[in-house]
Amino acid sequence: MSKNEINTNINIKDLNLWYGEKHALKDISLDIPEKSVTALIGPSGCGKSTFLRCLNRMNDLVKSCSIEGEVLVDGENIYDKDVDVVDLRKNVGMVFQKPNPFPMSIYDNIAYGPKIHGCSKSETEERVHKALDDAALMGEVQDRLGDQAFSLSGGQQQRLCIARTLAVKPEILLFDEPCSALDPISTSKIEDLILELKKDYTIVIVTHNMQQAARISDHTAFFLHGEIIEFGKTKHIFEDPQMKSTEDYITGRFG
């Protein structure tokens, strides 16, 4: 492999998606680099969150949704009929816009996934502690693991949700505007965490925050009207965009 080649483990080919009659994603083809952060940017309604949800088949939950094309994860089309969606979502974890802890203890939130996947008590405990460490939360909650998750601050709840996702040992992490409901200090902690996690995980993040995309992502895709207008290294997208619409969006002329 040449120095210019990049390993990818998510490969999208000719992806089209409809909600009823609405053509929401149009002929999307994209190769997402592994163990790096790819940001999806664009104005509201451009298709970036819809696209993100295609990567672990969350759109299956929308009755009016129909999809054509391929989404390959490690070479396997996740839309093949024989794909186990539960296993897929274990491998491709998602963290949502607002923290959504389960109504149970901090410990049980993280233990839930390993338990339902058949882990022993000792392995579950090991995974809980590692996930809390990896989510940079252990130091803040180690003496209160039995407390209700809702007793945590918003930023802590979001890191708890990240830890819960990590506990089932995914390969890929999807973030749908994970900081939009958080204060600047909590946002900074999440960003630092994402930069640390990319050493071991492929990360795709939807964000409306251009500064955030510039700070934490290695590559950026600009969406508009259900299409990818431009994709490349974040530095190039922000400093030397090739399309006028990309430049207009990044500089705040529309959005």
Swiss-Prot record:
Task: State the compartments where it is located.
Answer: Cell membrane
GO molecular function per UniProt: ATP binding; ATP hydrolysis activity; ATPase-coupled phosphate ion transmembrane transporter activity
- Keyword Cell membrane among UniProt keywords: yes
Name of the top EC class for this enzyme: translocase
What this chain does, per the entry, is described as:
Part of the ABC transporter complex PstSACB involved in phosphate import. Responsible for energy coupling to the transport system.
Q: Where does ATP bind?
A: 42-49
Question: Which SMART domains does UniProt cross-reference here?
Answer: AAA
Native organism is Methanococcoides burtonii (strain DSM 6242 / NBRC 107633 / OCM 468 / ACE-M)
Main localisation:
membrane
Topology relative to the lipid bilayer, per the entry, is: Peripheral membrane protein
PROSITE patterns in the record:
ABC_TRANSPORTER_1, ABC_TRANSPORTER_2, PSTB
Domain named ABC transporter is located at 10-250
NCBIfam families assigned to the protein according to its UniProt record, in alphabetical order: 3a0107s01c2
Its protein name is Phosphate import ATP-binding protein PstB
Family note:
Belongs to the ABC transporter superfamily. Phosphate importer (TC 3.A.1.7) family.
Q: Which reaction does it catalyse?
A: phosphate(out) + ATP + H2O = ADP + 2 phosphate(in) + H(+)
Q: Known EC number(s)?
A: 7.3.2.1
Keywords assigned by UniProt, alphabetized: ATP-binding, Cell membrane, Membrane, Nucleotide-binding, Phosphate transport, Translocase, Transport
Subunit structure of this chain's protein = The complex is composed of two ATP-binding proteins (PstB), two transmembrane proteins (PstC and PstA) and a solute-binding protein (PstS).
